[in-house]
């Protein structure tokens, strides 16, 4: 790589090693930033992904690689939504077209994927804690590498981030936390004075001078202490007026910023000064989410995480099978609004995902009954418990994978007290391209054993409506889990009925083999059973459990006693999941003797990324696997 300013046709393709970025001149860095954005936009338009966050940190990524050595220094990208440029510059340029594709590279940093992904992420607010641990490990090992955590302003709303700040500040180890602020709420602070404060009030020379002046003032008899106190008040007043850093300084971090996150050269200079401080430093960087792509700049919320879109306009690509059918998320959102119209006790709570969970319309129609707590799942659950304790009917709208973060609150604050909180778990089961950090693979297992909790897994969008009305009509906690994606085309109701508590339904009566399914696997099982009967004459029973807890003991025992074989289906890990519960119940009723049982569900493993269709095939829960298993159980050939 040249430092002479010579023109390179394609700078990105010339990068052979991450350290090559440090050899580029200003013009080449600008060209590289443009090329990175072009590659990211083109790939995400085809594959979907987190576009706006990654576009906003291109220059920040270049500055990091201009200053630090990724072969030695450790980087932790919080959540990982913003790590696409990092992937392109750290050896995955040629594979980038496979981003989020089955057997391609992950959409998140992943330790198993690259030696430059120093910590795997996917859920928010973990970076500071992980980096603090790495800094301690470095010091214990006697190494001298830098440790850098890059965290967005959204992730800083979580308690875990402040727990990490508290620990890191207390330990006082050399650590750089970069706060990527893309909300632009304090953009007015970007300017000459802010730059002066960033470069000078925190520089090593000024800090040494300040200590010398303090020592001298203390030696002045009579007025020294008073002068020192006045000087400190003046300095703190100046800094707090122009910067928001006092909060971080309270955690014993040296605050630097805010600085322009799109000025590579200046950002690199500030990083160089920050790394020279032998203590925790928080560098506050201002970026524009979606920068370089007008549709994403105009609508960064939509382009935060997006499916395939038209490159020229940013319009979402249309798919034939989704043009007319609503998604489960949309059905949930519209049903919640309908129920809230009739019951003023209904409160909607989300953890920083109003649109993703379907409560955006609720927030606009019922702003006084809507609460976005930020990325604070633990708080969301206990906050809901407080509302429920006072007679309200809170609905916590959350992705299945994120509810894991509030497990103790579910047990201790909600279920122990039998409070009427409704948990609506979107993305139950295989979520698709976001992969193992986002699959809702464990909820039935980690919720099923909690006393007082009712769990419903509706078979379709109409049953989702019924489940919601059932939950809000009850007097205890209820969890409703449903998959990502469109429904099956079930008829929706303006006034859904209430489900009989703990009662499933026999959809098809047969002989010999009974399929006991729940949630997303019910309709595929029914379709396969009907196909087999048409082609072979063999009638298979199909039972929709509906309730994971309590199970319909009466009907399940009857099925076990009237069939030679049972096939149990779920889109959850079979370890401790729905099928485990069915087997426990049947064993307790002593009706498994002589009954052949097969289970199809998710494995005791972290499932990779890919489309839902690909992953259901991979894990053996798709229609083909159900058909193959049923034919084997019936003693038939394909």
From Swiss-Prot:
<dbReference type="GO" id="GO:0019288">
    <property type="term" value="P:isopentenyl diphosphate biosynthetic process, methylerythritol 4-phosphate pathway"/>
</dbReference>
<feature type="binding site">
    <location>
        <begin position="122"/>
        <end position="124"/>
    </location>
    <ligand>
        <name>thiamine diphosphate</name>
    </ligand>
</feature>
<dbReference type="Pfam" id="PF02779">
    <property type="entry name" value="Transket_pyr"/>
</dbReference>
<keyword id="KW-0479">Metal-binding</keyword>
<dbReference type="InterPro" id="IPR005477">
    <property type="entry name" value="Dxylulose-5-P_synthase"/>
</dbReference>
<dbReference type="GO" id="GO:0008661">
    <property type="term" value="F:1-deoxy-D-xylulose-5-phosphate synthase activity"/>
</dbReference>
<keyword id="KW-0808">Transferase</keyword>
<dbReference type="GO" id="GO:0052865">
    <property type="term" value="P:1-deoxy-D-xylulose 5-phosphate biosynthetic process"/>
</dbReference>
<dbReference type="InterPro" id="IPR009014">
    <property type="entry name" value="Transketo_C/PFOR_II"/>
</dbReference>
<comment type="subunit">
    <text>Homodimer.</text>
</comment>
<keyword id="KW-0784">Thiamine biosynthesis</keyword>
<feature type="binding site">
    <location>
        <position position="182"/>
    </location>
    <ligand>
        <name>thiamine diphosphate</name>
    </ligand>
</feature>
<dbReference type="Pfam" id="PF02780">
    <property type="entry name" value="Transketolase_C"/>
</dbReference>
<dbReference type="InterPro" id="IPR033248">
    <property type="entry name" value="Transketolase_C"/>
</dbReference>
<comment type="similarity">
    <text>Belongs to the transketolase family. DXPS subfamily.</text>
</comment>
<dbReference type="GO" id="GO:0016114">
    <property type="term" value="P:terpenoid biosynthetic process"/>
</dbReference>
<feature type="binding site">
    <location>
        <position position="293"/>
    </location>
    <ligand>
        <name>thiamine diphosphate</name>
    </ligand>
</feature>
<feature type="binding site">
    <location>
        <position position="153"/>
    </location>
    <ligand>
        <name>Mg(2+)</name>
    </ligand>
</feature>
<feature type="binding site">
    <location>
        <begin position="154"/>
        <end position="155"/>
    </location>
    <ligand>
        <name>thiamine diphosphate</name>
    </ligand>
</feature>
<keyword id="KW-0460">Magnesium</keyword>
<feature type="binding site">
    <location>
        <position position="182"/>
    </location>
    <ligand>
        <name>Mg(2+)</name>
    </ligand>
</feature>
<dbReference type="GO" id="GO:0005829">
    <property type="term" value="C:cytosol"/>
</dbReference>
<feature type="binding site">
    <location>
        <position position="377"/>
    </location>
    <ligand>
        <name>thiamine diphosphate</name>
    </ligand>
</feature>
<feature type="binding site">
    <location>
        <position position="81"/>
    </location>
    <ligand>
        <name>thiamine diphosphate</name>
    </ligand>
</feature>
<comment type="function">
    <text>Catalyzes the acyloin condensation reaction between C atoms 2 and 3 of pyruvate and glyceraldehyde 3-phosphate to yield 1-deoxy-D-xylulose-5-phosphate (DXP).</text>
</comment>
<dbReference type="InterPro" id="IPR020826">
    <property type="entry name" value="Transketolase_BS"/>
</dbReference>
<keyword id="KW-0786">Thiamine pyrophosphate</keyword>
<dbReference type="GO" id="GO:0000287">
    <property type="term" value="F:magnesium ion binding"/>
</dbReference>
<dbReference type="InterPro" id="IPR029061">
    <property type="entry name" value="THDP-binding"/>
</dbReference>
<comment type="pathway">
    <text>Metabolic intermediate biosynthesis; 1-deoxy-D-xylulose 5-phosphate biosynthesis; 1-deoxy-D-xylulose 5-phosphate from D-glyceraldehyde 3-phosphate and pyruvate: step 1/1.</text>
</comment>
<keyword id="KW-0414">Isoprene biosynthesis</keyword>
<dbReference type="Pfam" id="PF13292">
    <property type="entry name" value="DXP_synthase_N"/>
</dbReference>
<protein>
    <recommendedName>
        <fullName>1-deoxy-D-xylulose-5-phosphate synthase</fullName>
        <ecNumber>2.2.1.7</ecNumber>
    </recommendedName>
</protein>
<dbReference type="InterPro" id="IPR005475">
    <property type="entry name" value="Transketolase-like_Pyr-bd"/>
</dbReference>
<dbReference type="GO" id="GO:0030976">
    <property type="term" value="F:thiamine pyrophosphate binding"/>
</dbReference>
<dbReference type="GO" id="GO:0009228">
    <property type="term" value="P:thiamine biosynthetic process"/>
</dbReference>
